[in-house]
Each structure stands twice: as structure tokens, then as C-alpha cells.
């Protein structure tokens, strides 16, 4: 999908410098993928411990002798 965006030149230059990626479309795609990954992880972490019915997973190891 083609989209026109206005991006801060300094921000784009800093991202290119840090990543080594010079192509603007690649920088934007990588940035969006990272944003989705970070937000997904944040939401998953926010769910931690919210299932009152959860039980401990069974362990496969036998007890040490």
C-alpha cells in the first residue's frame, strides 16, 4: 500500500545511522514492525498472572537423589 507521510528528517537520519539502513521505505517498515513487536510484548506482559484458574505446568524432570 502506498502512503504519504511526513517524517522528521533528523529522526529519519538517526534511524538510518543506527541501523545502517538507508532506504526510507525499509526504515519505516522496520520501525512499524518493531513498534508492533514491542506493543504486543507489553500487552502480553500486562496479562501476566491474570488467570485465577491457572495451574503450574507439569515438570518432566524427576526429583534429584
UniProtKB/Swiss-Prot annotation:
**Any GO BP annotation:** positive regulation of growth
User: Which function does this protein serve?
Assistant: Antitoxin component of a type II toxin-antitoxin (TA) system. Upon expression in M.smegmatis neutralizes the effect of cognate toxin VapC32.
Region: Disordered, residue numbers: 46-65
UniProt protein name: Antitoxin VapB32
Give the keywords, sorted: Secreted, Toxin-antitoxin system
The highest taxon in the source lineage is Bacteria
Where is it located? Secreted
| An annotated GO cellular component | extracellular region
Entries under InterPro entries matching the protein: VapB_antitoxin
Does the entry feature the keyword Secreted, yes or no? yes
| One Pfam family matching this protein | VapB_antitoxin
- Name the species this protein comes from: Mycobacterium tuberculosis (strain ATCC 25618 / H37Rv)
Amino acid at each position: 500500500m502506498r502512503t504519504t507521510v511526513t517524517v522528521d528528517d533528523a529522526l529519519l537520519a538517526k534511524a538510518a545511522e543506527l541501523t545502517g539502513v538507508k532506504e526510507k521505505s525499509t526504515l519505516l517498515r522496520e520501525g512499524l514492525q518493531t513498534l508492533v513487536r514491542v506493543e504486543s510484548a507489553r500487552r502480553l506482559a500486562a496479562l501476566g498472572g491474570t488467570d485465577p484458574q491457572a495451574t503450574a505446568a507439569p515438570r518432566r524432570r524427576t526429583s534429584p537423589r
